[in-house]
Design a protein with these regions (language model features):
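Catalytic-core segments of hydrolase enzymes
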Residues: 1-6, 109-189
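Generic structural motif recognizing short loop/turn segments at the entrances and edges of beta-strands
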Residues: 13-18, 172-174, 180-182, 196-198
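Predominantly extracellular/luminal regions of secreted and cell-surface proteins
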Residues: 187-197
Length: 198
């Protein structure tokens, strides 16, 4: 199913994005004012997490010309079905309800997905995930963004895989050409402020 809505029509579904649905019943109108009433995400969080999981191979990708290379998701040949159950443009503060998330999980089960990737923290939805696991679906949840202490990790049900980001032990050297044509190698550091301003 490719559900049509604001900023999203049937042409947005393809051989890569094979389905799209959105859920907003019960979400306050104020929370939806800066959001697309469609499977499209206003803050790119869903796009980011989907590309991390299943992004196609893109040669010569870079960030404003820096750190050029090949970008790809963990499973670049995988197809994506979008079930947008949380809305809201504030980073880390989406608006949704247990009902919208459970409806999305139920639809994903019915549609026969192989993997559910949920980048949200809603502990009470772990039983929806249990139903998916009982149907043979691998369920992967985000651990959250609350810090490094074990007690702040969300989505800890024993039947789901909980993933988190970590610091990496490598740098991204980038060649910079100065006005006098001298080239120097520098380490690239990208901050949230820079990303938000771009």
């Amino acid at each position: 199913m490719c559900q049509v809505g604001v900023g999203w029509d049937r042409s947005n579904c393809s051989r890569k994005i094979i389905g799209a649905r959105f859920y907003h019943a019960g979400v306050a109108e104020e929370e939806l004012k800066n959001e697309y009433l469609s499977a499209r995400d206003a803050n790119s969080h869903g796009t980011h997490t989907a590309s991390t999981a299943a992004g196609s191979i893109v040669e010569a990708a870079s960030f404003h010309g820096l750190a050029a290379g090949t970008a790809r998701g963990g499973a670049p040949r995988a197809r994506i079905a979008v079930y947008k159950s949380v809305s809201g443009s504030a980073r880390g503060a989406g608006a949704g309800s247990s009902a919208t998330v459970l409806a999305a999980i139920d639809d994903a089960i019915h549609d026969g997905v192989d993997v559910l990737s949920l980048s949200l923290i809603v502990e009470e939805n772990s039983f929806g995930a249990l139903h998916a696991v009982q149907k043979g679906i691998t369920v992967v949840y985000a651990a959250g963004n609350s810090g490094p202490a074990p007690q702040v990790v969300g989505n800890t049900a024993p039947w789901v895989i909980t993933v988190a980001a970590s610091k990496i032990d490598r740098s991204f050297p980038t060649a910079i050409t100065l006005g006098n044509k001298q080239r120097i190698m520098v380490r690239n550091r990208i901050t949230w402020k820079y990303l938000n301003d771009s």
